[in-house]
Amino acid sequence: VFTFDELISKCAAMRYPLIVFCWLFLLCSQGFGQNGFDPNYRLLHSSSYIQDKNFYLFTLLEKVPSAKLTIEKDEVLHGVLNAQKKRIQEGLSQCDTSVSCWINAFNANPEEQKLIWQRLGELCKKEKSIQALVQQHLRPSGAFIKYAEKSDVEMLQSAWTEACGGIQYILNSYALGKRGRYASIDSASYAAKSLMYKRYLMVAGHFLAEKTTSWTLFHQPATWYALTLMDMNNRDEAARHEPMEALENHKALEYIPNIEWSKYPYSVILQPGHGPDIADVPLSPMGKFRVQLVAERFHKGMAPLIILSGGYVHPFQTPYAEATEMKKALMEQYGVPERAIIIDPHARHTTTNFRNGARLIFRYGIPADKMALCTSTMDQIVYIADPKYRFKERNMLELGYLPYELFAKISSHDVEFKPKIISLHLDPLDPLDP
């Protein structure tokens, strides 16, 4: 694996003609030079989809053998791990039901986080295995695409800093009971400050203490603790319906390579969901209206594919996913074939309807430069398209970027858009749908 500068140097040394320089420049400017994302890259998986989506850096450290070996053998990082293990063992006799004590035992403290940040940078400068980790995984995966313009060292360090923020967010929400971004739908399932819950956390600490002998990487104590907290609260939404490519979206993926895109004015119709506010109701009245709208447009031939976006959102801890319920209705009531339906059963907000829809477009090989259509009830289209409702500002506040570029509002139920590739960036500050 060579950097662009190394390739140029090698070409110059071999006296390759100018056309080779031009070809290399064109190659990099069209692909990896711009953002590094490779649509042919296949994400690696650990035993936990929740970890994979929230902390893909950690999955890579576990699943890429050369990088894992480098990290395991490093004395500095191994020293941090040993310090954490020692605190956990001390916690067995000292923490009792003190939540902060258990958090301090499992999580790297600020000094350790800074030391890890520094050491990862040093390793990236001198170890080929860590350089390859960035160049062959972090960059082409798209999972860290917000940092595409950074150097390899800076990208790796930024990924670590972001992961630390994600761990802390989970600890705050599911151990300390602090209000997160969307507390009404994403909070702990138990009263976090109750003695009962504190006892649960104490038991979890003792349970995980038995696992410490199997941990060989610096991130594992905090990651295991965070994932355990989410499991205790039945917060596995990010993992539900995975692997989608082999399950719910399998038929669509088989169909996509055979689509004649020129026959359709739009690549996809994105359909945001609407969760019912009443328990035991699978599909809300608004959801039913939206299903009929998108079915009508599909049967008119406006697009070959429909993306249904909406997760397990309303009411709190609902057993129904908006996307799967809409899919049932489209197939059973409106005769839409399964091969034309892609589901995103994870989005929890209108912002992430667009973000997740964009991700599916880029990852599933749908032409991203072709216009797409968002179809919904008039109230939501007004909210999306009318500047006075500040939907763009909400995206910038919650995501840090716009996952779409809006074009014409062609009716009260439809607005045109194109996806933005920055949507591929994974967000551990939204752990139920990162």
What are these regions (language model features)?
Residues V1-Q34:
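Bacterial Sec-dependent N-terminal signal peptides
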Residues N35-P434:
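A structural signal for short, hydrophobic/glycine-enriched beta-strand patches
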